[in-house]
Each structure stands twice: as C-alpha cells, then as structure tokens.
Amino acid sequence: MTVTRRATFMLLLLIAATLPAFGQVGRDWGVERRSYQDPVSGVRIDELATVGVNDNLYFHFSNFTADNRYLIFSSTRTGTPQFYRAEVSTGRIVQLTDSPGGTLRGICPDRTRADRVYLIRKDEVIALNILDFSERRVATIPPPFIGGFQQPTQSGDGQSLTITKQVDERTWEIGLLDVRRGEYRTVIRQGFRIGHVQHSPTDPLIFYVWETGGYAPQRTWVVNSDGSGNRPFYARTDPKSWFTPLKEWITHEAWVEKTGEMTMINDKQGVMLVDKAGVARMVIEGDYWHVAARPDGRFMVIDDNKGRLWLLETATGNRRLLATGLRDTVRAVHAHASFDREGHYVQFHTGRTQETIAIIDLRELPGLKWQ
C-alpha cells in the first residue's frame, strides 16, 4: 500500500469512528404534534408524539437543549426505547439513537453546548452531536460493577458528569467523570442503595438519597465533589420539629438551576424549598407528587396522583391549574414535569389518551386564575 493510499485509508477509518453506529439514527419522523384545550383550565396543550410509547427524561435537569430549540425524549416506536429530539417550534421529530435493546442507560443534555447530549450505552459514556449525529466515546465506566447505572447529571461548569453504579450486592458508588480527559474518579461509596444522584448546578456538591422505596432513617445526603464532607442534607432529627406527627418521607428532589436551592416533596404534607444549608420551608401544603422549579426559582410546576398539573408561585404559595386528566388512560404515568432553560415552557409526561410527552407555552396562558 502506497503512503498516499495508506493515509487515505486511515482518514476514512477516523471519519467512520465518529459516524453514528446504527441504521435509523437521523431518521426524520415528521410532525405528530396535536393540540387541545384543557376542559377545566382552558390552557392550550401540545402533545408531541403519537407513535409508540413516549416518555420524558427525569426532572433533575431541563429536558431541553441549551438553546431551547429541542426537547429530548425517549420512544419505543422502533420496538425498543431510543432517544429522539423534537423541535419546539415545529414539533418535528428526529431519531438520535438506534442502539440494541436494553443497552441505553440514561441521557443528559449538555448545558454548555446546544448540539450535544451525553448518554450511557452499556458501560460507555458517549458524547452525541444531535445535529450531525457523530459520536465520541468519552470513557468506559471502570469496573467493578454489577449494574446500577442511572441518569448522569452535569456539573455547573459542564466539565464533569456524575456516574452512579452498583459495585456489588451491598455497595453503591458515585463517581465523577471528566468529560474532556475521560478520567473517572470515585467520590463516595455507601453500603446502601443510592438514588436520585444530582450534581449541584451552582456549587461543587453532589446530592443523593438512601433509596428504600419508602421511609429511610436519613434519606437525603450531600457530599462535596472531591469526596469530602459527606453529610445529611435535609434532616429533622427531633420529632417535635416534624411537619407531621408521622415520620417524614422526603422524595422527588431537584436542584434549582440558578439559586442552588432544592425543591422536595414532603409526602402527603406539601412542597418544600430547601436552602444550601438544608433548612426547609413549606411553600404549599397538600398531597403533591412531583415538583421542579423554573431556573430562577420564582415558579414551580407540581402535580398530584389524580393527574392534575399546577403552576406554583414560590414566594406566595399561590397556584393555578394548568392541566387535568394526565392519568385518565394510562394510570402508570408519572408527569415528571419540568421547565425549559428560559422558563417559557413546561414539559411533562401524560397518559390522557396515550403515553406521550406534552408542552405548555406559559406565555400563552389565559387570564390569571390563581388560587
């Protein structure tokens, strides 16, 4: 082989290494968006996908790209769960992955680059360009592990991803992956199941919970990103200070993007806002299910088990109804609602007529009806 031919061959290999690995990546599924007016609230709602079972990402971070142009979601329309982008302005859906069934573990839009998401496929962390569909392998998650991979989250500067894994039958680990160097380091190991791992968007802190599926002696924890200072986060150790005579169950926690506070559900008691020191205040009392805040923290979106969705004003606790009937057809649906990057939209999972994703443009709300 001549030097010129060899150089050409090596260049082709290099190009091939960055191209999407599977056949349906980049497929244009067209526009499936349909709109309706909620019969109770009068709010216009756009459902974005009609083919297959469609789901949003967990609400620990915005499901929108950094430029607010696309909403990232999953769908089973090809037979296995894959990731897609939906253009907010048009509703046009384009396929982002075509991985073998059961190999995708989670995805996280890059807050610093609008064209990039990070995903976990098998034990590899991939940087995927959602415009040209090229891929870069960031790193392979180092053993030992027996699974337990969860949705990655990004540090505020965009330089690191949290990685969660189950080391063995009794041990769980949180690690940090440097996305530029591909270097992984262990932050902490615990002898209990770890869940809801989230890097703070404002501070070098990682939040996590002792996951039991119910009450835990101490559910919420925070650790410095260098592994030091592991400590309980929100804690009320004196029963006299509990919001309820029953043991508290704190759940469905999420950082507030620009303030470094955290929203939490106090089960059957209400919605809490917790500061960086772990001190909480009750924003609104009631039996709510999930909560996420607008990036500036001024408003929250909350839902309940009856399939109703509200916009909540943080300062006053006033709320207004956005949507109803989210569990009318598919009872298993969890709304997992959250805001876009600018606070213009609310996105959520709905089972009103089928399992799909929907958005509400808050700038088009009818006259205020606060309660």
Regions found by a protein language model. Give the residues of each.
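Conserved blade-ending motifs and adjacent loop-strand segments that build the rim/top face
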Residues: P239-K240, R281-R294, G317-R341
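Blade/loop signatures of beta-propeller domains
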Residues: Q24-D46, E173
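Blade-terminus and WD-like Trp-Asp/Gly-His loop motifs, strongest in beta-propeller folds
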Residues: F61-Y70, G106-R116, I120, Q151-S160, ...
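Asp-box/WD-like beta-propeller blade repeats and closely related beta-sheet repeat scaffolds
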Residues: D98-T171, G182, T186-R193
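Short loop/turn segments that connect beta-strands within beta-propeller blades
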Residues: E87-G91, N129-F133, D178-G182, N224-S228, ...
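Beta-strand C-termini and the immediately following turn/loop, strongest in propeller blades
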Residues: L19, Q24, I72-T78, T97, ...
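Blade-level signature of beta-propeller repeat domains, shared across WD40, Kelch, NHL, RCC1
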Residues: V333-Q371
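A short beta-strand motif characteristic of beta-propeller blades
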Residues: D46-G52, R92-D98, S134-P144, E183-I188, ...
